[in-house]
Amino acid sequence: MFFDREKELSKLLKIIESEPSLITFIYGPINSGKTALIQEFIRKMPDHYVAFYINLRATPITKYEDFIDILFSIEFENPIKNLKEALSLVISAGKEILGIPIPNDFLKQILSENKPKNAFLYITKLLTEVKRRGKRPILILDELQVIGDLRINGPLIYEIFNFFIHLTKEAHLSHVFTITSDSLFMERIYSEAMLQGRADYFLVDDFDEKTALNFLKSQGLTEEEANLALEYFGGKPPYLIEAIKHREELEDYCKKALAMRTRQVYSFAYGKRRIIKLLTEFKNKEEVPFTGKVTRTLEEAVKANILFVDPLNGIIKPQGRLELLAIREALRMLT
């Protein structure tokens, strides 16, 4: 559900007004509304744009062939015979096409050769033709971290970054947006020397208090009910939606949600002094400084979806309000 992200939406629409020059990395805590924002962004784009949207989490990716399958995963009744047919499909698709259309024979060739360069050359050629037809192409990859460790004659992610740099900084052919909820992956990207001066970073955080209250009240909750939901769930959109669904037993639902999350945090931290020490930093604080060093302890807490690292703003914080409360409850049980 999309609600009141006009500021973020306006910024995204402003980005595509200018010539492509930077890769835009969209990041934020889990379930903060990144994908909902990008879908609304696509809907609000002017008609002369076309977005190629690829969700890398659509199916498991364990090897290069899986990545190629998702990249070019478009199902049509009849196989695509040539570039002209692929181009026709893009032009007639409207403002969004899920995946990149490719002639069947060429797809087989790309899969047999195991050379990402050939796949990227084809995409460049297709985007060039799309632009010649008066459309402005936009490439969007959701859940980019899924391929972070994939290798094909070396790490695939570096070849992808080089390709994105070519599309934006060098050829000015297409805007490129990537989306991730993995803050460790985001920290790795932010520290990557090859991306310095070639990338921009766009934080999509949970709703602030005012927006969350307005959302809850717009869905029929009273001031008292809205404040109760906010106390437990902060501005995490999916949690707020669930709170609305459980309005009839809202207080009981909130308490049960916190109890469950507390058990998860307790189980994660039990018997681990270094984890407990890290979590103790949030006993009286909602966020702490991030020095730039990712310790094994911090990595574990982030992978467990308990903490979120924001390398751009230099902070570490719980993934959301519920996690903050659960950390504090678990600490009372552990110490």
Curated annotation (Swiss-Prot):
Keywords: ATP-binding, Nucleotide-binding. It holds the Pfam family ATPase_2. It comes from the Archaea. ATP binds at residues 28-35. GO terms for molecular function: ATP binding; ATP hydrolysis activity. InterPro entries: AAA+_ATPase, ATPase_dom, MJ1010-like_2nd, P-loop_NTPase, WH-like_DNA-bd_sf. Disulfide bonds: none annotated. Belongs to the archaeal ATPase family. This is Uncharacterized ATP-binding protein PYRAB06260.
